[in-house]
Amino acid sequence: MTKLRRVAVMFSSLLIVLNCYAQEKDSTSLAKKTPGITSFILPTALVGYGLISLAGNNVIRDLDFTTKAELQEDHPLFAAHADNFLQFSPAAAVFALKFAGVKGRHQIGDAAGIYAMSMTMMTGSVTYLKKLSKRQRPDNSVNNSFPSGHTATVFASAEFLKQEYGKEYPWIAYTGYAVATATGALRMYNNRHWLSDVIAGAGFGIISTKASYILYPKLKRLFSRNQTSAFNLMPTYQSGGPGFYLSGNF
């Protein structure tokens, strides 16, 4: 229960901060129509579902074992590794559409910044919980099963696609989430994750992207407030992961 309390405190604090930001009036075009706090209810419930499975023997954990048994019984030799590249496909679609000239919510620079922030938040939270939970994978390979990183990545990407193009092209959003769901299913069919790993991973991914749409405009405005100091905040990829590069002239 100590693990659950620590994670619960972290998420409660995050949601309080996001609620404060979401309720602020914002006159800039970048911050228009940011996700409201109510949009975090479903992904938070998904994370909560997964956290309950860490509490020991309960109905949710039992469902993990029965789901694994059924999948292994029906498809004992299943092996398909499309999930390794599918996890990035919704985000790749966003940038492909932007390069093709299809207008979304943001210009490509801001979209890249939002996505980099989402990936940074998602990777940090997932990596921390993998080390904290030390859950063994269903194939008994390693103890870093919870939550599913592939699923978190693809759902963060699917939410990114939805936020950028879902209003004008709803079918694009549906396609992104269909790909995300298929990726999560493949993680279980390949015997790499439990059901609760996948469900929690989906929640972490969605929360990371929604939070980035709230926090990125605040962070960008913070560094551009002083016009006499030329600051530039740019997304970057280094040391095997996404991040930000800040430069400035004083």
Q: What are the roles of these predicted feature ranges?
A:
Residues Q23-A93, K130-D139:
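N-terminal transmembrane-helix/juxtamembrane module of multi-pass inner/ER membrane proteins
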Residues A79-A82, A112, A116, S148:
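Hydrophobic alpha-helical transmembrane segments of multi-pass membrane proteins
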Residues L54-A55, K98-K103:
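Structural signal for the C-terminal ends of transmembrane alpha-helices
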Residues V94-K98, V126-T127:
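Membrane-embedded alpha-helical segments in integral membrane proteins
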Residues G101-M121:
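Interfacial segments of alpha-helical transmembrane regions
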